Swiss-Prot record:
Its EC number is 6.3.4.3. InterPro entries: Formate_THF_ligase, P-loop_NTPase. This is Formate--tetrahydrofolate ligase. One of its GO terms (biological process) is tetrahydrofolate interconversion. Gene3D superfamilies: Domain 2, N(10)-formyltetrahydrofolate synthetase, Formyltetrahydrofolate synthetase, domain 3, P-loop containing nucleotide triphosphate hydrolases. One of its GO terms (molecular function) is formate-tetrahydrofolate ligase activity. It catalyses: (6S)-5,6,7,8-tetrahydrofolate + formate + ATP = (6R)-10-formyltetrahydrofolate + ADP + phosphate. Pfam families: FTHFS (PF01268). Keywords: ATP-binding, Ligase, Nucleotide-binding, One-carbon metabolism. The gene is fhs. Belongs to the formate--tetrahydrofolate ligase family. Pathway: One-carbon metabolism; tetrahydrofolate interconversion.
Length: 552
């Protein structure tokens, strides 16, 4: 067993990190020695300052264990600082579900981490707990309203919100609630989503102030009356108390990297289910405090990056000046369906199909108007000829290429990437949205499916078609769409690797997130409450007699 906290011996007091980016002691709230909340007043105080440039970090379709996007983003920010510029990396807060489930932590690794990593991966400053509480307060209020006479006439079968928990637990996906001895409540089907996939999390990440937060929470659609009129959270009068529960959660969290540069970690929406980027208030604050903000969008360009452009940028005016597309030899071989231990002497002749996946992601970023650097996250067993093949391919595609060794060497291993990103950020073209606000929802879905995924067409289920009619009736067709699908493929089938052609995207359901202001489009077998695998990560975590975490 080994300690997973030794790297944290380099930690500096968070007040010193705050000082480096121009924050006074009265502008942060300490959560212990190494974590702090940033005051929302910063945006008013720094209003006259020029906004820093935004660098968007994305990837190709990943393997189940990720491709080092977070490690690369952290290393890139550290490298930009090392070159003499001021940079802050902004990231999502890790969810306990993946940390204790399959993927493990989401704080980078090796010489390129955010710290204190174990605190961040566990309860951190309690933001996700607050989101869970606010979400479940709303759910409790709905059932309580029905129990006490149902003045609004809510149809229990029409309730659209689900309870939330920050844990992978498949047994809670579909449940029955309302069983009671007094038989006054409504027995109905319900379920749980993981907290980071809840609409409350999306609302938190898209809100800029307490008034904005409360308004969005009040607009959450909770269900319909028996005569099919919509019911919102504000009709139950709990949106104020929900906002109160989120009072501190709205403030971004300040931590540090393994080289003692600033990192703002705030919000945690999943990218395959939700919109997949840290809060806009965190990025806005980082822009006022630095010259370059490195933002990570979850999973590949087909998910996190697409949603950053079409949801986050559209709503916030935060436009990236350049993009970094993270790739690994391992992932390319995966997309070429080459097993890691297949006995092949070289993968040079066998990753061409994998390069097709990279090609599509490069095309996607070009479509969205982003100048791009492909960053190869280097592993020790990567062969020089494999790296050169990828380099040559990128040159043919007309994009920059750089090898990243942030995990091993920290900022020193990403200096070339940082230099190329800085240079490219001065060349930014106009951002292109994939669809327009005025497009019909069906048209928006088809544009993303055909342009970004490469689908031939889209097939809508009966449930999805009925929701399209509901969207028209509620007059929310102007909302952007939040595509919800597998992260492992450009299609909705996780087994369809590489660059699939002539496939049909299956839209199974559509959800109206009226508070967040977008439409969730469920594709394939996507599930909002993950389950644990047989050998899940929590089986390898422990604590010693001194309270130090250990990894087995």
């Amino acid at each position: 067993m080994k300690s997973i906290s030794k790297v944290e011996e380099v930690l500096e007091p968070i007040s010193k990190i705050a000082e480096k980016i121009g924050l006074d002691e009265d502008e942060i709230e300490l959560y212990g020695k190494y974590k702090a909340k940033i005051s929302l007043d910063i945006l008013k105080k720094k209003a006259q300052l020029q906004e820093g440039k935004v660098i968007l970090v994305t990837s190709i379709n990943p393997t189940p264990f990720g491709e080092g996007k977070t490690t690369t983003a952290i290393g890139l920010s550290m490298a930009i600082n090392r070159l003499g510029f001021k940079s802050i990396v902004t990231l999502r807060e890790p969810s306990l579900g993946p940390f204790l489930g399959l993927k493990g932590g989401a704080t980078g690794g090796g010489a390129s981490q955010i710290l204190p990593s174990i605190d961040i991966n566990l309860h951190f400053t309690g933001d996700i707990h607050a989101v869970t509480s606010a979400n479940n307060l709303l759910c409790a209020a709905v059932d309580n309203h029905i129990y006490h006479g149902n003045r609004l006439g809510i149809n229990p079968k029409s309730i659209t919100i689900k309870r939330a928990m920050d844990m992978n637990d498949r047994s809670l996906r579909h449940i029955i609630v309302g069983l009671s001895n007094d038989q006054k409540g409504a027995i109905r089907e319900d379920g749980f989503v993981i907290s980071v996939a809840s609409e409350v999390m999306a609302v938190l990440c898209l809100s800029m102030s307490y008034d904005d937060l409360k308004e969005k929470l009040g607009n959450i659609l909770v269900g319909f009356t028996y005569d099919k009129k919509p019911v919102y959270a504000k009709d139950l009068n709990v949106h104020g108390s929900m906002a109160l529960l989120l009072k501190d959660a709205l403030k971004p969290n300040l931590v540090q990297t393994s080289e003692n540069t600033a990192a703002i970690v705030h919000g945690g929406p999943f990218a395959n289910i939700a919109h997949g980027t840290n809060s806009i208030v965190a990025t806005k604050i980082a822009q006022k405090l630095s010259e370059y903000v490195v933002v990570e969008a979850g999973f590949g360009s087909d998910l996190g990056a697409e949603k950053f452009i079409n949801i986050v940028a559209r709503k916030s005016g935060i436009y990236p000046q350049a993009a970094v597309l993270v790739v690994t030899v391992k992932a390319l071989k995966h997309h070429a369906k080459i097993e890691e231990n297949s006995g092949l002497q070289s993968g040079v002749n066998s990753i061409q199909q994998g390069l097709e996946n990279l090609e599509k992601h490069i095309e996607n970023l070009k479509v969205m108007g982003l100048e791009t650097v492909v960053a190869l996250n280097k592993f020790p067993d990567d062969k020089d000829e494999e790296i050169e093949l990828i380099r040559s391919f990128c040159e043919e595609m007309g994009v920059e290429f750089s090898v990243s060794s942030a995990y091993t060497h920290g900022s020193e291993g990403v200096l070339e990437l940082a230099e190329k990103v800085i240079r490219l950020s001065d060349k930014r073209k106009r951002i292109n949205f994939v669809y327009q606000d005025s497009d019909f929802i069906e048209e928006k879905i088809k544009k993303v499916a055909t342009i970004i995924y490469g689908a031939k067409d889209v097939k809508f289920s009966k449930a999805a078609l009925s929701k399209l009619e509901l969207i028209k009736n509620l007059k929310v067709e102007h909302f952007p769409i939040c595509m919800s699908k597998t992260q492992y493929s450009l299609s909705d089938d996780p087994k369809l690797l590489g660059k699939p052609k002539d496939f049909i995207l299956n839209v199974t359901d559509i959800e109206i997130k009226n508070g967040a202001g977008f439409i969730v489009v469920m594709c394939g077998d996507i599930i909002a409450m993950p389950g644990l695998g047989k050998d899940f990560a929590a089986l390898h975590l422990d604590i010693d007699s001194s309270g130090n975490p250990i990894f087995k």
